Every structure is written in structure tokens, then in C-alpha cells.
Amino acid sequence: MPTPVAAARQCLSPAAVPALDAAVASARRRAHAQTTSLHLISSLLAPPAPPLLRDALARARSAAYSPRVQLKALDLCFAVSLDRLPSVSASSSSGAADEPPVSNSLMAAIKRSQANQRRNPDTFHFYHQAATAQTPAAVKVELSHLVLAILDDPVVSRVFAEAGFRSGDIKLAILRPAPPMPLLGRLPTRTRPPPLFLCSFAAADDADVPSPAGNLAGAGEENCRRIAEILSRGRNPMLVGVGAASAADDFAAASPYRIIHVDPNTIDRSDLGVAAAMASATSGLIISIGDLKQLVPDEDAEAQENGRRVVAEVTRVLEAHSKVGRVWVMGWSATYETYLAFLSKFPLVDKDWDLQLLPITAVHAAPAAAGPAAAGGLMPPATTVAAFSKPAASLMDSFVPFGGFLCDNYEENSLTANSCPQALRCQQCNDKYEQEVATIISASGITAEDHHQGGLPSLLQNGSMMGPNNGFDPVKVRDDRMVLNSKILNLQKKWNEYCLRLHQDCQRINRDPYKPFPRYIGVPADKERSANPSKGSESIGVQKDVIKPCAVSAVHSSSTARPISSPSVTNKRNEDLVLNLQARHSKSDENLQERGMQSQHGTLSNADNPDDHASPSSAAPVETDLVLCTPRDCSSKGSSSTCSKRVEDSERSVHLVPKKVDDLNLKHPQLSVQPNSCSWSSINVGKTSHSTLHSVASGGFSAFGQWQKRSPLAAQNSDLSNYKLLVERLFKVVGRQEEAVSAICESIVRCRSTESRRGPSRNDIWLCFHGSDSMAKKRIAVALAELMHGSKENLIYLDLNLQDWDDSSFRGKTGIDCIVEQLSKKRRSVLFLDNIDRADCLVQDSLSDAIKSGRFQDMRGKVVDINDSIVVLSRSMIHGSKNGLEEGLSFSEEKILATRGHRLKILVEPGRAITSGCPSGKVVVSPRHFLTKIQASLCSGSISKRKLSMSDDQEKLQESPSSLKRLHRTSSIPFDLNLPVDEDEPFDADDDSSSHENSYGNTEKSIDALLHSVDGSINFKPFDFDKLADDMLQEFSNILRKNLGAECMLEIDVGAMEQILAAAWKSEDKGPVQTWLEQVFARSLDELKLKYKHVSSSTLRLVPCEDTLPTVKGDGLGVLLPPRIILDC
């Protein structure tokens, strides 16, 4: 029996009565027989209604679709549902009351709301005393309680589900509204508000929460409120828009914090560090970097260097005071293009600074709703009857503030306002988080190459067609891409908090709070699951050469990938404990338990895609179960599958020029590696018997794109795991060793995407590089340090083949002591241990223990954890081979490494004939008495592959005492000085030889056991120095023919040739050597032509002098190639 409207109106509070009146008016206008829950919810969605439900929807969106499409679909779904209700004739509808009565379902919801309010702990005594009146109006239903009860109506829940919403999420957003004041400071435990129960939501609205930002209420600026909310969550705002500068000035005038303006030209490192150190004792510090345009100048080299110095210094200060949490950074830009250029130049600041983009589309924001509680825009507008006096408008008008950018974050839907200090999730919650992230990526619809509504149901596609021109809207795509990052972060925080609240006894996965956005990719994890390929999501486009999320999945994917690292989270305590009611698919968990989840990994997400799982985009109603305090979610299917292409085997690079692996439309600056410069202060590649522990210098910014990741290590910015992108970046740095680079990337992706075989809490990766080409190994290590940990300074290098360390800083220390000392300074780094097979037994035993335990321990008992680090073990011997020497090559890496820089001299010998090489050869390599007589010739017309041979006499000559001594010195014989010496034992040559062999055999077994425990073993091919020598001879021939004619011949001493090859090998490409040939060698030939008349018919000899070149500090090849060649006529 329907209830008269007057009777229902008596049960409602004054704030809820206008909502009922608006619903009755809507039913009367549509000629419906009764006023239902659909009418009431539809009236609350109209712009004139109180913003309670609209704000909850903005925070509780499932984020499966773009904001415009989903909200337009919700408006359409309610319109269609209301049109389906039966209408009555005009004669029957004209009655005395002329008001459609309240339906039974709506009245039942009102009764349930009364019961919930009656059980409210805050008002229990009041209603208990009022219960003696025995009147139905003893409990006046508030609007929030009424909406919560209506959301339990199956009809209403089905309509929300058709638009992609879940009733449980909407309830949670209503129960946990946004705080009335921005909490800019982290509240101590004693002052946090009381917990929020299902029926005590009024406490959250009226709680007196102390805040240091109280004076911001008088600023009257909406932009100040938005900036304050970002700071309260521990993020760093970056203002973009025409009014960004004025908004920053307004906030600086009203902020209680100390604000330091950083000038790139006059930045003072000491002042900034002192101010940041005092931030913990004050209200806080905000570092203002000003306009981003001054950090990204066009062509001014000095201004660019100043910008790099500012970014490096601000990054250092933020990292040093990350635990204190009272230091922020803020900047602004008038155009979005400048912001993109800033991210392109400094791609890692988005992660390191934890930036949040804040669009400012007007110089001054519009004032908040009228009412004393809404002054300054810091309080939500009051619910009044006048709010319903305006005519109804489209639902979208209220959901797209600030020129179409939806700035409300999903974060308010979480259990607490901020994440815990360290993001922890169990495997179950992590899997469900990855499902939601994959749903966002696969259905976000922001790519320009495919239709943005391809994965949506027909109802949502119809809603999206209402946009301008009934097609693709680039403005909408830009806005959706801007808000995608904040969605991922808020989802991550939500699941972290769920897991901490509900799964306290489960084993958790430790996530680093300082890693970027997640990237996921499927890789073969084990043989049993590798046969099931996974479906990848559509890629998200690249804009303005800034590395944006790009979905790439592997052909063979297996178990659920673990994220790599989580973004920075704040230390604010949990404020509320709420009751979570969330719909789930009834068969979803059964499918996850019965069979292995198939992973779909994108750059920003990782989600499992069982084939029989229902898609959340389905418009049909689904059977749901309401589960108390158990977060559930449904799995989703990828919208389309893309297979990542492996790097094809290509011809070995001799010119050291990077090859194009697979075009991703990405432009990365080249990483400059100068082995003999101060940036490699401790890696002197020219010395094989002496090395030091070092850290590579850095300019303060990365040469690579932003490496986003996240959750067990990371991918809370995403699994690090974009295989294709990682291969391309490493290959651009190395320029050769295609197979080794591919194997390294595959090992890293596998370790990041699957659970470590050493346990779920282990995130360290152990790799072993076999073979020669030490320069390629070191360049890869430098690139990994920058890609994985943000800076080349995070590389630790140690050569374990040290018989004596001359450096005073190493005196009295063992190799393990140096490793522990450096790892204690750089907990997240790449540890490169060279010549592992020549290390002493103590170091090898310590490494074996470190692989098992995940920590190093020095001789004094100091322990350092290696979690999140990459340990690279290097040896010259190729895996599976008994020796690592290059066979059949004229120039070996050992000789090139031993080369020192000598002065060069040109000798003129008239009429001397060249007896070696091809008959027409004009440039040859001549022998020298103490080296093998290697003769290589190059015809001036064409290049032919030289087949060099070595005679038996030359082989015997090579076996010199010095070489035998060197081989004996580098043998891996454990010699422990801590063992006692038995002086009475007679020396026996046979016994000593036998013990020598036994010790060597034990050492080899220990090394083999150590190398079998690593995550990946990679073989490096020997560098083809002979081919490089051919190219160098061709360059000499061209210059010789150009300056002295075709009749002149040149002999290059083998020592001089090794010196030139060493310079070319250690440089990034042939550019520096080519410049030396064109400027130094060619100039010497011109001088020789002036001094010697018959030089064109003579034979020239380029030989090295005995005196070495002076040591040159800084970049360049001055230690190998002289700036001037001596002429001896």
C-alpha cells in the first residue's frame, strides 16, 4: 500500500524534505503512479540538489572508464529507467492531493534509515528518551542515511551497475566524506578524530579536527583549498594554467608555512639544506621553484646547467627529509606544453618529487556555495530548500568543474585519508589491486590510434556519442591522460589500507615507497605456465616525447606479476574505521583459486585475465553477494592483445653506433660514459691489475625516460617490466651485445614480474656476466643504476682481482668490508663485482651467504640489507667454456686494456718497400720486437677481411716471463692470512703442487655453486677488435690519400695501433677518434709535406715513444691519444 507523501515527509529531516519534494515533482511531471527510489536518486543527481551524492560518485567511481563517458552513461541510465516506469492517464492522476504517493520500496528505505539512526552511538540516549512519545516522527531521517538505505534497493543498484558504479563504493564515499578542513600537518595520535561507524557519519562532518591551515579559510580562494588538499596528502602540487602564477602567489600569502623561492642563477645549497633541516621544528617548508619555463630554456647552455642544478638540489633535499614529511616543493607553468617539456628533460622528477598536476583554468576561482559554513570554499555547501529552486540541468554540468577537468580524486574513497608510512599488501590484495589497475588501463579509452569506446558496452558507447562531432575529442583525451596517474595512486593507497585493516595476520609483500608508477609485462616464469599467452591492453600514446604508459605484453606470460615499487606515501595516521560493503562476482574467487591467474601486464598495471571472467563493462545485471568487511573485486578481460617483439639478432656492431631495436616513437638522450674521465673516477679501464671502489658521478638528472613501477618492488608505479622499452634503452647505451642485453632485460623482467624464488620479501636481483667486453658490461651497469634507481651515483664498482690496494682509504679493509661500507650509504644501488672468479675465499663465502640471506656482513659484524638492489657478478670466462681468451684474433681485449697512452712519432724512410700485406696496400700494421708480429693490411681501393696468422715461433715468443707471471698472479688460489702457519712442516714440491690443485678445485666448485644461485647468467661475445682495426686503417688510408697522394705508404706500429683501438673502444662511438684523425694526424701530414719534399714517394712509420702521456683530468681521450704527433724527418 503506497504511503501518502505527507506521512513520509514527517519522517524526514528538514535537509531531506526538499529531496523528497523534488522526487515527487519529477514523478508528477512524468505522470507516474508512485514516487520511487529512482525518482529520489535522480533528483539528487541534478545540479540544484545538495552535492552529497554527486561528490560521493566523483570519489567512488570505479575508474574503469573515462569520467565524461561514465557520468554521461549514469545520466542516461536513470533517464531510461524512469522512462520504463508505467504512467497513468491524466484523469486518474488528477486528485485532491495531486502528488504521487511514496512507493513501498522507498518507504522501506526510510524505515531502515530510522532504525540506523536510532542505533547511532552519538544520539542513542536522545532517541531512547524520545521513544516514549511513540510517534513515527520521533526519528527524523537525515539525507545521508536515506541515501545509504536507498542504495540497498536492488533496482537502484542495478542502474548504478549499468553505468559502472558499485553501491558499496558509493556507500563508503558517503560514510567517509572529505575532511571539512585541509589537514596540512600530520595529526598526532592523541588529536585524531574518533573512529567512524556505519551509523555515526555525523561525527565526521562535525568533528573538531585541529589543523594548522585554519587561516586559509579567510583566503576565499578555491585554488588555495585545492593546493592545501594536495599538501595534506603528502604530494607536491604542480600548477598548470593561465592562472597558475596568481594562484601560487595567493597561496603563498595565506600559507602558514615558510616558503623559499629558488632562483636557478643564485641557488644556495647550504641555505636550502639548513631551511629544510629546520622544517621539522616549524610548521613546514615549501620550496617554490617558480615558473618551469626558466628550468627548461631553449638553447642557453648555462641556463640549462642551472636548471639541472636546481632539480638535483631539490631532489636531494626531498630525499633527505622524506621521513620528516614537512618539506614540499611547488612550481607552476602557464602552459601544459612547458610542463611536458619539463618532464621530458627531467623524467624522474615525477616519481622523485611525487608530483600531482593541478589545473588552474581561471585567475581567480568562483566563490563557494553560499552559507556561513562554506566560507572560503573550505566547507561543503549547506543543504537548503533553496538548493532545489533552480531548474534541473544535465548531470554532466555538475561533474566537470574547471573547464572539464575532473579534479576529485578516488583517494577519498579509501579507508583513511592517507596511506600508511610503508605500503604493505598481502598477495591476495595485491592481485585484486592489479585487477583494478588493469581495468583502468584497458578501458580508459585515451589512445588516439584506436576508438576510445572500443571496450565499452553499447550503453556507454551511446553516451560517449553525445560528445562534440559525435567522435574523438582530443581535449577529453588530454584531460583523461592527466588524471590517469592520480587514479592509479589512489587505487594503490586504497588496497594498502584495506589490507592493513583486514588482513593483519597475512604475510605481506614489502613495497618500497619511493618507486614510480607500476609497469607490468608478462614473461616466462616457469615451464608449466609458459604455454598460456596473456592478453595485453591497448597502448597509451606518447605525447610530446614524454614517456607515457605504454602497454606491452609478452608472448609467454605466467603467474601474476609482482609490482616493483610503490610511490611515496604519507605518515598520517588512519582516521576512521568503516564498514566496507562491496559487491563482488560470485564466481571470481573460485576461478582464482582453482587455476593460475594469467597476467596481463601494461606499463602502468598488472591484472589477471581468466578467460571465463565476466567483464565489468557488461551492461547486464550481475548476481552479487554483500560481504561484510571483505574487499572484493572482479577480474577483467583485456580489450585487445599486443605481443611484445623480441630483439632480432643483428650484425655485431663495430662502429659502436646503437641500432634500432623496434620503433616505439621514443626519443631518449644518449648516456655519456667516459671511462677515463672524472665521472668514472674509480674505474680506470686501462688498468686490469688495479681498481677501486667508486660511485659514478651524476649530473643530477636522468638521461632516460621516467621508469615507472611498483609493487612488491614497485610497480606501484608498475612492474618495471616493459621488456621492449627496457631493451631499447639499454641497447641505446651499449650499442652492441644484442643477445646479452635481451637476456639481461628478460631476467630483470622475470624477477620483477614473478615472486622471487628466495621468498616474497626478497626484491634483490643477482646477475652474472660471463665473457669479455668489459666496457659493455660497465656501460650496462651504469644504465641499470640510472634506470632502476634514478641516478648513475647508485652504481658501486669493485674489482676483486686486487693483490694490493694502494689507496689509503682501502688500507686494512677486505673486499667485503668495502662492499658493506658502500651499501650502507646506498641501500638501493647496482653492485658491480668484477673478476669474481679471482676473489679470495672470504669474499666468495660472503657472497654465497648474501644470496641466501639477502644481506652482507663484514668482518666487524656489521650487517647491511641488499633488498631492492641489483648485484652483478662479472668474470672473463664464458659460461660453459674452460677459458675466456679470444682465439684467432690479432688484437685481444687483454692487450687493449693493458695499453697506456704514449706520445706518437712519424718517421720518414725514403724508398723503403713494404713486404707484408696485399701488393697494393698503402697502410699496414708493422710488427714490433717484443710483441707478436701481427701484420694487417688494407687496400686503398676496397676493404677485405684480413686473415691473420701466427707462426709457431711467434707463439713461443709470446710466452714471455711477464705474461706467465701475470697469469700466475691472477689465478684463483685461496690464501687466507687468518690461518696459522706450520713452520716445522718440511717443504715438499709434490705435496705443495697437490694442495695447490686441491685448493684450486675447491675454489672452482665454490664459484660454480655461487654462480648457479644467481637469477640470470649472461654471456658476452668478445669484441671484434680486428674489424675495428680494419675500419681505422681505412680512415688512415683516406686521410693519407687526401693529403699526400696515392703513392705514399704508411706503416703503423702495433703499439700505436693498440693505442688507437683502445681510444675507439673506450669511447661511445668513433667520433672522438675520427676528430683526432682529421685534426691531429691530418695536420701532422700537412706539416710533414712542407718540411719534406719527397714525402709523397716515401714510406711513413707511426710509432709510439717510450715516454707516456701526462694524466689528464676531465672528459676526453687525452690519456690515450696525444694532442700533437712528433715529426722526425
Curated annotation (Swiss-Prot):
Give me the ranges of the annotated region Disordered.
519-573, 587-654, 975-1001
Q: How is it modified after translation?
A: Polyubiquitinated. Strigolactone, but not karrikin, triggers rapid SCF(D3)-dependent degradation via the proteasome.
Tell me where in this chain the Clp R domain is found. Answer: 8-180
Q: Where is this region: Repeat 1?
A: 12-85
- Which stretch carries the motif EAR 1? 577-581
Stretches of Polar residues bias are at 596-608
Could you name the domain of life of the organism this protein comes from? Eukaryota
Do you know which InterPro entries this protein is assigned to?
Clp_N_dom_sf, Clp_R_dom, P-loop_NTPase, SL_signaling_regulator
The record's CDD domains line, in alphabetical order, gives:
RecA-like_ClpB_Hsp104-like
Alphabetical keyword list: Repeat, Ubl conjugation
Q: For bias kind Acidic residues, which ranges apply?
A: 981-992
Q: Where is the composition biased (Basic and acidic residues)?
A: 645-654
Q: In which residues does the motif EAR 3 occur?
A: 975-980
Region listing for Repeat 2, in residue ranges: 102-180
Gene3D superfamilies per UniProt: Clp, N-terminal domain (1.10.1780.10), P-loop containing nucleotide triphosphate hydrolases (3.40.50.300)
Which purpose does this protein serve, as stated in its record? Repressor of strigolactones (SL) signaling. Subjected to a negative feedback control of SL signaling.
Q: What is known of its domains?
A: Contains 3 EAR motifs associated with active repression of several target genes.
Q: Under which name does UniProt file this protein? A: Protein DWARF 53-LIKE
Origin species: Oryza sativa subsp. japonica
